[in-house]
């Protein structure tokens, strides 16, 4: 079995007496989509924040490519190849599509931001940004203001910005949120193709997308993983059905 690209060992977080992450163990392997599902308030956002560096765990470690990144800031994890997309858009709406992608590429580099010279003049950053826009199908809209994109296209742009990091692993927080049937199908196809470039840790409420994409599913309830395994096993697990999926799954 191949070594995991991303690994979580014994991650624990408490807010007073409330345990929001209870000794969580997770792995993400090359070529894999590992979905995390669970009801609202289960602790998914808190878990993702700890994995990506926005929140420090009380116990446990996070490893990326075999290196312990637990004590690193979010930007340093990103530069090491941990690429995150957010449930709520973090794009610069008044900038162009290309500018958003170039700024993503600049953030991934260790070069100075260069406020006194146009970053679009950096041919290396522009080339990387354009390649990532092309990968998600937005290169023809590079000059458009981001605010003019559809909701689905903004989701695609968020993936393109994440791609500029040349990621080792993606952490995606509800990429299907707000998408209709057509947009959801397009995003499903995009994510399915991305897994060979970098595996995806996917937090998602859209169960059709989860069961279509995931190689493994972990179910988080009240800060604890109650089940983890292939989709068919999760679908028929009675504890999972009782806690989250219901009998109609």
Predicted regions and their residues:
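Glycine-rich phosphate-binding loops of nucleotide-dependent enzymes
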Residues: 2-249
């Amino acid at each position: 079995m191949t070594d995991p690209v991303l690994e979580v060992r014994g991650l624990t977080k408490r807010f007073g007496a409330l345990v929001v992450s209870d000794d969580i163990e997770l792995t993400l392997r090359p070529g894999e989509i590992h979905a995390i599902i669970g009801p609202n308030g289960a602790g998914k956002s808190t878990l993702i924040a700890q994995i990506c560096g926005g929140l420090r765990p009380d116990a446990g470690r996070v490893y990326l490519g075999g290196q312990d990144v637990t004590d690193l800031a979010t930007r340093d994890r990103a530069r090491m190849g941990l690429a995150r997309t957010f449930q709520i858009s973090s794009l610069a709406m008044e900038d162009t599509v290309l500018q958003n992608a170039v700024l993503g590429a600049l953030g991934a580099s260790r070069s100075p931001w260069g406020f006194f010279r146009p970053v679009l003049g950096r041919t290396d950053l522009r080339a990387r940004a354009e390649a990532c826009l092309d990968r998600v199908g937005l290169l023809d809209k590079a000059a458009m203001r981001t605010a003019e994109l559809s909701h689905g296209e903004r989701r695609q742009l968020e993936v393109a910005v994440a791609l500029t990091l040349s990621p080792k692993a993606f952490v995606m927080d509800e990429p299907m949120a707000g998408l209709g049937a057509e947009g959801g199908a397009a995003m499903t196809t995009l994510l399915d193709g991305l897994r060979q470039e970098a595996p995806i840790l996917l937090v998602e409420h859209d169960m059709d997308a989860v069961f279509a994409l995931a190689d493994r599913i972990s179910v988080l309830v009240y800060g604890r993983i109650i089940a983890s395994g292939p989709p068919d096993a999760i679908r028929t697990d009675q504890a999972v059905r009782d806690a989250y999926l219901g009998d109609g799954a």
